[in-house]
Design a protein with these regions (language model features):
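The two-metal-ion catalytic cores of nucleic-acid processing enzymes
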Residues: 1-256
Length: 256
């Protein structure tokens, strides 16, 4: 704002021995919330954007544009766009449980407790398009996984290649929503820990849709009457909505 800029020289010349105090309002409001409120835009609703400029360097989306915020306006539409929704789950191997009589949960810091497979199901909302996909490790005894009807099976020689193959699949199919069950309590933490052991954390960074914001393991503490005390650990993928069904079930049903 030119008027605001014109005040800066005057402020810089104030006597530093007599500091002034200013009230700061709404400093904790995220810019996008302020934007949607100012433009009267409802969350997860349709908008119309005019005078756009295509930008292929800012994001990894199918379509990426730049526009002035004044050129974004709300649209009264009730239909839902064809979002791609993905559900995924991992299987991990406990070397101790497999080769001893001790029933021990897989430990991601143990080099032998590898991820053996990651399964993903995709569907496009409002259509009958569905994809079932699994990446798995080649067995030293049985070799590659047998074909599975209706499922795309990719077999890899190593856990490193398996994780990289899954990341490439997610980037290629580009789901807007990812659904897990206890993903915030186990899956993401395990995947990120294994990536660290294998020194391939950089591969997971590419799951963000925003070039300038790599995906990173994020931890949140949640304390509510509905959910109780919870620690959530997940890979923060900018531009992708993630849902953990376990938290929804805990909210709707009292588990004993």
């Amino acid at each position: 704002n030119p008027k605001e800029k014109s005040r800066l020289p005057k402020i810089s010349k104030l006597d530093s021995n007599n500091p002034l105090k200013f009230d700061l309002y709404e400093s904790n409001i995220e810019p996008y919330l302020r934007f949607t409120h100012k433009m009267n835009i409802k969350m997860a609703s349709w908008v119309k954007v005019k005078n756009i400029t295509q930008d292929n360097e800012m994001a990894r989306c199918q379509h990426s544009y730049i526009a002035h915020y004044n050129n974004v306006s709300p649209q009264e539409r009730q239909d839902i766009c064809n979002l791609t929704v993905g559900s995924w789950d991992i299987e991990a191997f406990s070397h101790t449980s497999r080769y001893s009589n001790i029933n021990e949960f897989p430990n991601p810091e143990n080099p032998l407790d590898i991820i053996t497979q990651i399964g993903t199901s995709l569907y496009k909302f409002g259509t009958k398009e569905k994809v079932k996909h699994v990446v798995t490790i080649k067995s030293p005894i049985d070799g590659e996984c047998d074909p599975v009807d209706g499922v795309i099976v990719e077999t890899y020689d190593s856990e490193k290649d398996l994780i990289e193959g899954w990341v490439k699949f997610i980037i290629k199919t580009d789901p807007e929503i990812l659904v897990q069950y206890n993903g915030y309590g186990f899956d993401w933490k395990y995947v990120c820990a294994r990536a660290k052991v294998l020194d391939i954390e950089y591969i997971l960074e590419n799951l963000s849709r925003i070039e300038s914001k790599p995906a990173q393991l994020h931890e949140d503490q949640l304390n509510t009457s509905a959910y109780g005390d919870n620690t959530m650990q997940y890979l923060k993928m900018y531009g992708v909505t993630q849902i953990d069904l376990m938290f929804l079930i805990k909210k709707e049903h009292k588990l004993e």
